[in-house]
Amino acid sequence: MSKGTPSMGKCHKRTHVRCRRCGRLSYNFNRKTCVACGFGRSKRLRSYKWMRKAGY
């Protein structure tokens, strides 16, 4: 393995694609889970109390 510029070429792939449930570009293709709504991880929508307070 080499460090620096040659290894930066491996970072060009898309990590997140469009989610089937929420439609946002936050579905991790490798982990098969959505960061925004929790699709693939749980049946329920991902929501927390601090989200209401923060305006999400």
Swiss-Prot record:
Keywords: Metal-binding, Ribonucleoprotein, Ribosomal protein, RNA-binding, rRNA-binding, Zinc, Zinc-finger
A family per Pfam: Ribosomal_L37e
GO cellular component, one term: cytosolic large ribosomal subunit
Cofactor: record remark: Binds 1 zinc ion per subunit.
Residues in C4-type zinc fingers: 19-37
Keyword rRNA-binding in annotation: yes
Annotated GO biological process: translation
InterPro entries listed in its UniProt record: Ribosomal_eL37, Ribosomal_eL37/eL43, Ribosomal_zn-bd
Residues at which Zn(2+) binds: 19, 22, 34, 37
Gene Ontology molecular function: rRNA binding; structural constituent of ribosome; zinc ion binding
Keyword Magnesium: no
Cofactor(s) needed by this chain: Zn(2+)
Family that this chain belongs to: Belongs to the eukaryotic ribosomal protein eL37 family.
Function: Binds to the 23S rRNA.
Stated name of the protein: Large ribosomal subunit protein eL37
Gene transcribed to yield this protein: rpl37e
